[in-house]
Amino acid sequence: MRSPKVKFLTIFTFCIFITKMSFASNSCSNEAGTMFRIEPNLIKAIALVESNLKKDSIGKNRDKNNNIKSLDYWLMQINQMHIPLLKKRGIIKDERDLLDNPCLNIKIGTEILYNHFSRCGVTWQCLGTYNAGFAMDNQKKRQQYAPKYILYIPGLMN
């Protein structure tokens, strides 16, 4: 059984980590929003919906047979399909960079969202492509995905 002191230190450390993450997320979301002309509250909402701000979260995308077909990394759940281009551009060395640097993850995710908006317009349907992609058979998934942000944005506006 842990002593009260150890429990306190564990909780204290966790609180500092969450506070640090929150400040980093706010600062980085604001910076990324300015860089790509996207509302910072939307960026924060995406991070909340995608990863629930869970450190080192790696999403596993599965096919109909439950086989892993791709991975998504941390805050903005950057899909592994982006890794080769990010390496080629010198932005990352490997996927670990997406897990170790929250600001970098937020900026890359925001750039991906910017590219989606440039392709299909600033609409809720286009926002759904951030998670579900552009495939025609993902139409229903896109429509279900975008409204999830609406739940988070009002609380972020305060």
Swiss-Prot record:
Source taxonomy: Bacteria, Pseudomonadati, Pseudomonadota, Gammaproteobacteria, Enterobacterales
Protein name as it appears in the record: Putative peptidoglycan-binding-like protein
Keyword Signal set for record: yes
CDD domains given in the database record: LT_IagB-like (cd13400)
Gene Ontology terms: cellular component: periplasmic space
Domain of life: Bacteria
Naturally occurring in which organism (per UniProt): Escherichia coli (strain K12)
Signal peptide (residue range): 1-24
Keywords for the protein's UniProt record, in alphabetical order: Periplasm, Signal
UniProt xrefs under Pfam families: SLT
Alphabetized InterPro entries for the sequence: Lysozyme-like_dom_sf, Transglycosylase_SLT_dom_1
Nucleus is among the record's keywords: no
Intracellular or extracellular location(s): Periplasm
Family in the record: Belongs to the IagB/IpgF/P19 family.
